[in-house]
C-alpha cells in the first residue's frame, strides 16, 4: 500500500479582512496517498484556494496538522519553507500565463525553473516538454502557443524540479472539452511515469472523473468524497459522506433542501444503518 503523502487533520486557517477575522478552514481533514490524483471541488469561498496555498507553502496554517512528503507545514521556518516550495511541490496557478515568462522560449521557461546543473536541466526540460507534446515547439514563446499548449508548458514548469506533489488550480478552465481531454491524457501518462501525486482544484466534471477521486469542500471542511470506477466510457460514481474524528458529518446540500431539514433532525439506528429524518412540527419547535 502506498504511503500517505499529504496528511492534514483538523486544519484551521484564519485571516483578517477589514478588521474582521475570517475562518477559511474549520478543522479540515485530507489524506492523499503517494501516486494518487485527487480533485478538490466546492463553491466559491469554500476554502479550496486556501487549502492549495497551504499545501504549496505559500501560507502557514493557523492550527491543526499539515504534513506533505515528511515536511511539517505548521512548523517550517522561512528558509525551510522556501526550500520546500522549490523542491517538494509544483504549483500551477489558475491563469497559465501567470506561470510563464513571456520573453523566454518554452525550453527556457522550463530550464529556468530547474535547480540542477546546466546539462542535467537541459535534458530534463527537453524530456518534460517532449512528453507533454511540445517537443517541436521548444523555441516558441508563450504568446505564440494556443491555450492547450500554454497549459502544457505551465505544467512543464511546475514539474521541472521533480516535485513529489503537483498542485493545479483549475488547470482546464481555459480549454474546450476536446483540448482538455488531450492535455489530461498526456498528463496522466507523465504523472504515472514520474510517480508524482497530484491535487487539482476544479469545477470540471471531466477532471473529477480523470482524478478518479473527487473531494467536496464546504464551509472550510471536507464534506463528501466521490470515487469513480470502471472504464472511461462507462464510469460509475460512488459518493460517500466524510466523517471527522469527532463523528461529525455534513449532509449533502441537495438532501437538506429536498427534505427541508432545519436546525434539528432525528437519527434512528436501524440494524446496520442510521436514518436521518425530519422531526414533526411539535418535536421541531424551538422554545
Question: Model-flagged regions — what are they?
Answer:
Residues 64-72:
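Conserved ABC transporter NBD signature motif
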Residues 166-169:
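Catalytic Walker B motif of ABC-type/P-loop ATPase nucleotide-binding domains
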